[in-house]
Swiss-Prot record:
Keywords carried by this UniProt record: Hydrolase, Lyase
Keyword Cell membrane: no
Species the sequence originates in: Lupinus angustifolius (Narrow-leaved blue lupine)
Start and end residues of each CN hydrolase domain: 29-301
Name used for this protein in its record: Bifunctional nitrilase/nitrile hydratase NIT4A
Keyword field contains Protein transport: no
GO molecular function: 3-cyanoalanine hydratase activity; cyanoalanine nitrilase activity; nitrile hydratase activity
Tissue: Ubiquitous.
């Protein structure tokens, strides 16, 4: 297996390409994960950047392109939104107002644009966004088909730590796996990948291309991705941002609480680590920690059946009479309105 990195024009991102030997009886899919930074508080500029990266990936033949967690809208790394137990600051509330303003409605014009881009470049697009639903924000993944159609979304079920201050909780109605000509595609976001029951639900839906947009650049993340590939007998595509301090607004507009005084504009605040892993646990491309990059591998879909010959976690290796899972896949709304229709009889009859 040869790893080839090809510089792009204008010193842009690198495209790490893996040429795999392929079984001629099984289809091969070229997958790309994007490792790049949001343009914080500037959603139109971030969408423009997404288009440039998508066009570049498509020029190399990518059929599915996965962007990082919260790429549209931004991951507010280092911010505490002025929160301490029993207290919220005026600046923190203003920070939330700006963050809310940078989020997108689903459906909405930004979703329409992303769908059009997927169709223009003929790729399946998996995009991390901050979704605005009224005044609640969700960390969400959007799915788009290569024909230019919005397919659906997954809302992060469990935000981690202080994320719970700014993001709502998804429910069981948005755990989709989409059957497409290039395989069954699903996604889990960042640390919800550590939730065994969520993974099991996705395996039960037959996920073959398991997308894992994340904000975790630690080396230990690689162990989680390898485990999921082996456990699920699926390809794992994990995309993370690569960010320096200069990719965020300068202080005092934006402050990395507790570390700002130690940072320079060139300080790396998120080191990437984007990776593509096969169902056998082999690393096909990445992890990359050196800067913005497009990371690609050719996925031999025959690897899925070969992996599941030994271990099919919700098939021949399951014991449903001993261990089983119930998933509540209906929406959970805080308010339900019901209307009773009253039949008015014509008393003249």
């Amino acid at each position: 297996m040869a790893l080839v990195t090809t510089p792009t024009v204008n010193d842009g991102p690198l495209f790490a390409e893996v040429n795999m030997s392929s079984d001629f009886n099984a289809p091969t899919v070229r997958a790309t994960v994007v490792q790049a930074s949001t343009i914080f508080y500037d959603t139109p500029a971030t969408l423009d950047k997404a288009e440039r990266l998508l066009a570049e990936a498509a020029s190399y033949g990518a059929q599915i392109v996965v962007f990082p967690e919260a790429f549209i809208g931004g991951y507010p790394r280092g911010s505490n939104f002025g929160v301490s137990i029993g207290n919220r600051t005026a600046k923190g509330k203003e920070d939330f107002r700006k963050y809310h303003s940078a989020a997108i409605d689903v459906p909405g014009p930004e979703v329409d644009r992303l769908a059009a881009l997927a169709g223009k470049y003929k790729v399946y697009l998996v995009m991390g966004v901050i979704e605005r639903d009224g005044y609640t924000l969700y960390c969400t993944v959007l799915f788009f088909g290569a024909q230019g159609r919005y397919l659906g979304k997954h809302r992060k079920l469990m935000p981690t730590a202080l994320e719970r201050i700014i993001w709502g909780f998804g429910d069981g109605s948005t755990i989709p796996v989409f059957e497409t000509p290039i395989g069954k595609i699903g996604a889990a976001i960042c640390w919800e990948n550590k939730m065994p029951l969520l993974r099991t639900a996705m395996y039960a839906k037959g996920v073959e291309i398991y997308c894992a947009p994340t904000a975790d650049s630690r080396e230990v993340w690689q162990a989680s991705m390898t485990h999921i590939a082996l456990e699920g007998g699926c390809f794992v595509l994990s995309a993370n941002q690569f960010c320096r301090r200069r990719d965020y607004p300068p202080p005092p507009e934006y402050v990395f609480e507790g570390t700002e005084e130690n940072l320079t504009p060139d300080s790396v605040v998120c080191a990437g680590g984007s990776v593509i892993i096969s169902p056998s646990g082999a690393v096909l491309a990445g992890p990359s920690y050196e800067g913005e990059a497009l990371i690609s591998a050719d996925l031999d879909l025959g690897e899925i059946a070969r992996a599941k010959f030994d271990f099919d976690v919700v098939g021949h290796y399951s014991r449903p009479e001993v261990l089983s899972l119930v998933v509540k896949d209906h929406p959970t709304n805080p308010v339900t309105f019901t209307s009773a229709s009253t039949k008015i009889e014509d008393k003249t009859k």
